[in-house]
């Protein structure tokens, strides 16, 4: 399974690791992904989904159905 948030589409960021002597090497900054079982209120069922912690925070605030709708994601396909 790829390291991509199923709601927001967030993926790894290419960056540089800079040492004390200023030598740069490439590094991947991975998204903080968590596998979660979330309750979908509108359909009265559980959904297993891989989301970032930032998306989880927004889901707690808005709700899973409203947040997915605002992003244009169809939860029935997940």
From Swiss-Prot:
Biased segments, Polar residues type: 1-20
GO cellular component: ribonucleoprotein complex; ribosome
Superkingdom of the source species: Bacteria
GO molecular function: structural constituent of ribosome
Chain spans, region Disordered: 1-23
A Gene Ontology BP annotation from the UniProt entry: translation
Keywords: Ribonucleoprotein, Ribosomal protein
InterPro entries: Ribosomal_bL28 (IPR026569), Ribosomal_bL28/bL31-like_sf (IPR034704), Ribosomal_bL28_bact-type (IPR001383), Ribosomal_bL28_sf (IPR037147)
The keyword NADP is assigned to this record: no
Pfam families: Ribosomal_L28 (PF00830)
Family, as annotated: Belongs to the bacterial ribosomal protein bL28 family.
This protein's name: Large ribosomal subunit protein bL28
Protein encoded by which gene: rpmB
């Amino acid at each position: 399974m790829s390291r991509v948030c199923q709601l927001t589409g967030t993926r790894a960021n290419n960056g540089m690791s800079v040492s004390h002597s200023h030598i740069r090497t490439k590094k991947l900054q991975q998204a903080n992904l968590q596998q979660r079982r979330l309750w979908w209120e509108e359909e009265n069922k559980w959904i297993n989904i891989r989301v970032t912690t930032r998306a989880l925070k927004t889901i707690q605030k808005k709700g899973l159905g409203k947040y997915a709708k605002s992003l244009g994601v169809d939860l029935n396909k997940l």
